[in-house]
Amino acid sequence: MNHLLDERKRRLSQFHEIIKKRPIETRPVDIPDGVFSQCEQCNSAIYNKDLEHNYEVCPYCSYHFKINAVKRLKYTLDEDTFKPLFENITSKNPLGMPEYEEKLDKGMRMAKMNEAFLAGTGKIDGQNLAIGVLDSYFMMGSMGSVVGERITRLIEHAAKHNLPLVIFSASGGARMQEGILSLMQMAKTSGALNLLDEKGLVYISVMTNPTTGGVAASFASLGDINIAEKSSLIGFAGARVIKQTIGQDLPAGFQTDAFQLQKGQVDLVVLRSQLKKTLSTLLKLHAKKVTS
């Protein structure tokens, strides 16, 4: 018996040596671009069709990918109900900033829009509303004079037609190429929201990743109901800048959606797949009966 066991060990050893010496053949696999995406949080490779079917949310860790304004409307509104407004208002270069026109052109190509804010009307489960979406693919969704004007006109349109208003924010803040003109939009958009308050119309603000700077410090934080989409960074300035300014250590994760909910900055944190249902419920609860 021992002889048989020794013989078996010897043959296994020979087999392993042969396998080790055998050259490994590798054949390159040509995978076309746009087939897979890598999750920023867990680094998993995800088949893009699976990602789209899952609302652009990682199936492994639930990280919410950034999406453009067109997809946002697709996931939020009833099919074929969106009617755009104010698309004829476009940005110029009022301060003559170098390379601003080139950045605008690049933003148009990346976002396939002529500005960072898409405004219009639509329906959610048959309920009419005014809706606006900031697109972070257009100059990081920054708010310049045209974005501020479109937002203000959308608010005025909602007030005039007795419509509830929903705005999705995704922005790095004020557009530095427009200087003080961009900062003025903070006061302008915030002041316009009084029109809805006077008429008893609900304004729902949905903060997505990221909502920062002058946008976070103005209309995005002034909703009657403030919602944060899961996986969103929300805050005014970066952690390093704040620490240098106040000279204090900051709480861990202080700009996350969970922290904002804990401290009362937002009322709800909602998964993207549940946003339409949540908005539909809120619109029904705050429906304003208009008698003609």
From Swiss-Prot:
Cofactor comment: Binds 1 zinc ion per subunit.
PROSITE patterns: COA_CT_NTER
CoA carboxyltransferase N-terminal domain span: 35-292
Swiss-Prot/TrEMBL cofactor(s): Zn(2+)
Residues spanning the membrane: none
Gene Ontology BP terms: fatty acid biosynthetic process; malonyl-CoA biosynthetic process
GO CC terms: acetyl-CoA carboxylase complex
EC supergroup of this enzyme: transferase
Main localization, broad class: cytoplasm
Pathway annotation from the record: Lipid metabolism; malonyl-CoA biosynthesis; malonyl-CoA from acetyl-CoA: step 1/1
Domain of life from the UniProt record: Bacteria
UniProt-listed Enzyme Commission number(s): 2.1.3.15
Pfam families, sorted: Carboxyl_trans, Zn_ribbon_ACC
Zinc finger (C4-type): 39-61
Residues reported to bind Zn(2+): 39, 42, 58, 61
Catalytic reaction(s) noted: N(6)-carboxybiotinyl-L-lysyl-[protein] + acetyl-CoA = N(6)-biotinyl-L-lysyl-[protein] + malonyl-CoA
MF annotations from Gene Ontology: acetyl-CoA carboxylase activity; ATP binding; carboxyl- or carbamoyltransferase activity; zinc ion binding
Protein family membership: Belongs to the AccD/PCCB family.
Subunit structure comment from the entry: Acetyl-CoA carboxylase is a heterohexamer composed of biotin carboxyl carrier protein (AccB), biotin carboxylase (AccC) and two subunits each of ACCase subunit alpha (AccA) and ACCase subunit beta (AccD).
Function: Component of the acetyl coenzyme A carboxylase (ACC) complex. Biotin carboxylase (BC) catalyzes the carboxylation of biotin on its carrier protein (BCCP) and then the CO(2) group is transferred by the transcarboxylase to acetyl-CoA to form malonyl-CoA.
Name used for this protein in its record: Acetyl-coenzyme A carboxylase carboxyl transferase subunit beta
Biological source species: Acholeplasma laidlawii (strain PG-8A)
Organism taxonomic ancestry: Bacteria, Bacillati, Mycoplasmatota, Mollicutes, Acholeplasmatales
Gene designation per UniProt: accD
